[in-house]
Design a protein with these regions (language model features):
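Generic low-polarity alpha-helical segments
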Residues: 1, 18-23
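Bacterial N-terminal signal peptides that target proteins for export
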Residues: 1-10
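Bacterial N-terminal signal peptides
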Residues: 10-19
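Surface-exposed, beta-sheet-biased, low-hydrophobicity segments with strongly acidic/polar composition
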Residues: 23-135
């Protein structure tokens, strides 16, 4: 009886440790579809049908003609050995999507506001297939 109690205790402890670890790993990756709101955070990988997206972070770039600078939000698009960084900014205040090409296909990324879905939360983006304005 004592051996069974020890075995149950060891297995229970192992499950208590492995369960949250595996759930945490699953939470760091999510699947998404084109044309849907997607929540993002730094370091999280989001799997779309044609590629994976990872939010890298934000950066400010200043220029002599605009010393205040522009705030850029950078996303890394990955598929196999191919990788590309997509940068979105409001620039001087125009909130438009960023067109990009990856693996021979056209897409666009929306932040802050989607032309079809409306206002987006600070931690949401939308990726559409095709070029913005061509639909």
């Amino acid at each position: 009886m004592r051996n069974n109690s020890t075995l149950i205790f060891v297995l229970g402890s192992l499950l208590a440790f492995v369960g949250p670890v595996s759930c945490g790993q699953a939470a760091s990756e999510q699947k998404a579809s084109y044309g849907t709101r997607v929540k993002y955070q730094a370091g999280q990988k989001i799997e779309f049908p044609d590629f994976t997206v990872e939010y890298v972070g934000e950066r400010r770039k200043t220029m002599p003609v605009y010393p205040r600078g522009f705030l850029y939000y950078d996303f890394k698009v990955i598929k196999g050995n191919s990788e590309k960084v997509i940068s979105w900014t409001t620039g001087t205040g125009i909130i438009d999507p960023t067109d990009f090409e990856f693996d021979g296909k056209s897409y666009y990324l929306e932040l802050r506001r989607s032309h079809k879905l409306g206002k987006l939360n600070d931690n949401e983006f939308v990726i559409w297939q095709g070029r913005f304005g061509s639909k």
